[in-house]
Amino acid sequence: MQCPHCQHTDSRVLESRSSENGQSIRRRRECLQCKYRFTTYERIEFVPITVIKKDGKRESFDRCKLLRGIVRACEKTGIPPSRLEAIVNDIESRLQQDSKREVTSQEIGQLVLEYLRQESEVAYVRFASVYGNFQGIRDFIAALALLQSSEIERAHPSWSQVEEASVITSS
């Protein structure tokens, strides 16, 4: 680290501690040449994620916008705000861990639906209706049928194996 006083490039760390709720590390340093003491901060640098909208426009990932959409879908469902915040944290973390720097709004919508399916059927259908741009009752019925079939699959995973076996034997 370069000394701000004499520009010498060697320094030693006297003290390190976590700061800003664990989001950075504060280091107290001393220049090896002039003995000047100074403080540096080390922070995580997140690579920005670009969201490709349905119309092809590109915009920066907006965590607040995602949270607003999820909160809206979960109104009056009893899901605590801390859980909604955790869902957004998980989604953002998954996006940051992916090597892609561009993601479609459809991919983000699918991630949200994965989480909401586990939390609340009502929130799932509400979010799906906006995300899927539902036009009428048939769209709602299709979403409910999909939700119901996945519930049956989760409750009775062997049923799909029985169905597969009957299809295989009837061929």
Curated annotation (Swiss-Prot):
Cofactor note: Binds 1 zinc ion.
Keyword Chloroplast (UniProt): no
Annotated region described as Disordered, given as residue ranges: 1-21
Sequence ranges of Basic and acidic residues compositional bias: 7-18
Cofactors demanded by this protein: Zn(2+)
Its biological purpose: Negatively regulates transcription of bacterial ribonucleotide reductase nrd genes and operons by binding to NrdR-boxes.
Superkingdom per UniProt: Bacteria
Residues in unnamed zinc fingers: 3-34
Protein name: Transcriptional repressor NrdR
GO BP terms: negative regulation of DNA-templated transcription
Domain ATP-cone: 49-139
Pfam families, alphabetized: ATP-cone (PF03477), Zn_ribbon_NrdR (PF22811)
Alphabetized GO MF terms: ATP binding; DNA binding; zinc ion binding
Record keyword Repressor present: yes
Keywords tagged on the record: ATP-binding, DNA-binding, Metal-binding, Nucleotide-binding, Repressor, Transcription, Transcription regulation, Zinc, Zinc-finger
InterPro entries on file: ATP-cone_dom (IPR005144), NrdR-like_N (IPR055173), RNR_NrdR-like (IPR003796)
Family recorded in the similarity comment: Belongs to the NrdR family.
